[in-house]
């Protein structure tokens, strides 16, 4: 099963920056991802999403984690998903 979740980036002991990735459930947080589908910076409140890639994985049955679900909901990705179906 594939999940959409956050992968921590940046230097140790610094403000965290995250990539939103599609990854197998059995992999660890920093493991090899299937594809990078977005970027999230909670300090600057910046978000970049590759919406076509996210929609592809959601249509194939990928499950977002709680935080990623909130980010996608705020960006309006789920309304686009319902429009495509």
From Swiss-Prot:
Keyword Chloroplast: yes
Chief location of this protein within or outside the cell: plastid
Tree of life domain: Eukaryota
GO annotations of cellular component type: chloroplast; ribonucleoprotein complex; ribosome
Intracellular or extracellular location(s): Plastid, Chloroplast
Keywords: Chloroplast, Plastid, Ribonucleoprotein, Ribosomal protein
Protein name, as recorded: Small ribosomal subunit protein bS16c
Organism: Cucumis sativus
Name of the coding gene: rps16
